[in-house]
Amino acid sequence: MTVETFKPKQTTTLDIPVKTLEAASTNAVTTGNRIGFVSLGCPKNLVDSERILTQLRIDGYEVTNSYDNADLVIVNTCGFIDAAVEESLDAVREALEENGKVIVTGCLGAKENQIREVHPDVLEITGPHSYEAVLKHVHKYVPKPEHNPFTSLIPQTGVKLTPKHYAYLKISEGCDNRCTFCIIPSLRGDLDSRPAGSILDEAKRLVESGVQEILVVSQDTSAYGKDKGGRTDFWNGMPVKQDITSLARQLGKMGAWVRLHYIYPYPWVDDLIPLMAEGLILPYLDIPMQHASPRILKMMKRPGRVDRQLEAIQRWREICPDLVIRSTFIVGFPGETEEDFQILLDFLKEARLDRVGCFKYSEVDGAVANTIAELISEEVKEDRYHRFMEVQAEISAERLARFVGRTLDILIDDVDEEGAIGRSFADAPEIDGMVFINGETELEPGMLVRARITHSDEHDLWAEVVDADTQD
């Protein structure tokens, strides 16, 4: 469906089903330097996992897909909301039961006592982006191999947990905003932007390795460079301004799709839209708005001028008619009245957003929002969630129907016996819809094809190939 509740995403090197681990244990073979890895949460956490795994491979460790073959398991946790905490604690429990030697890192790791209360046998716990600490602990329990002749085979892009044709590019860490429902700044700190040259170097390596789509992520992507005080960086001997518009312009020149995620609604977002209209970056804007009631937005410590937001949406679409807007909202925020909720529904009907995610408010330990107003009952939250979903599903169906009859570039993600599955510029991996191309079993993941859209529903598209680019 178009509207989804939050469910932590789990990526793991341990792809043997749990039910087979016990049987496999009798034949397990260990070399003394094998690491298993479980990564939970958002794409930003996935990038952290890739960085840790890359350094482990450089240090000579092997990455295994079996609990039994692992000399140690690392669990990179998520602590965004209570559902994420539960998922993380369950993953730690499974790793302890199936292996016994576990290091915990990530957002939930910032709350060591909470983990120790449930899992006292965990070897070590570190917080988010504590790469060096994680590696130090690994070296302590699984001594670093003396030599690995295959280290030189690690690609320049490092270890990637995504398919080879797309990759996440993290441009900063932390956030300077203090939204009352969020504890990310307390876990990951204030905004810390990467040097532009470093980002562009990584992007170039990704494209040269065959990556067709770069997904730009951070806690607050549109704030990139605010902490740099206007200082420029250098790339290829040329000065580069360190702001999101300048960075996006440079990324757009590399020949891959560039998709921006987690755009806070600052005024200078306007500067990105012409780049989308020019085709430098994808006409796709992931801009979490969270609510539409001025009263609730004020309680959230979010921008509260809905009239300005509607004006901005209209202005953006005039400049870039193909623009796809994704947003997320929270229903059942403490103190939310029926009137507040109706304002939100009215906003949806007027804004006509393309893709929308919906969260039922969840009490996050340490969030200011838990205590600023009366909590909403689960029954009311559930009712509002379903009403929200019903309204947005109709809007999303209408927005997708405009593509029927058009020919679009489709990036192929998967191929099975029924045909190919891909995405258009309107679809980010994992969170948006897909384009189904039935019968095309000769295509391969990573191929870019031209396809005519023949059908749509509220979430997905169906298409027929017009022309295929055989370059992976």
UniProtKB/Swiss-Prot annotation:
Q: Which SMART domains match?
A: Elp3
What main location does UniProt list? Answer: cytoplasm
Q: Where in the cell is it found?
A: Cytoplasm
Domain (TRAM): give its ranges.
401-467
Q: What is its EC number?
A: 2.8.4.4
- Radical SAM core domain residues are 161-398
Q: Which reaction does it catalyse?
A: L-aspartate(89)-[ribosomal protein uS12]-hydrogen + (sulfur carrier)-SH + AH2 + 2 S-adenosyl-L-methionine = 3-methylsulfanyl-L-aspartate(89)-[ribosomal protein uS12]-hydrogen + (sulfur carrier)-H + 5'-deoxyadenosine + L-methionine + A + S-adenosyl-L-homocysteine + 2 H(+)
Q: Which family does this protein fall into?
A: Belongs to the methylthiotransferase family. RimO subfamily.
What is the recorded name of this protein?
Answer: Ribosomal protein uS12 methylthiotransferase RimO
Organism, scientific name: Shewanella baltica (strain OS195)
Q: Which gene encodes it?
A: rimO
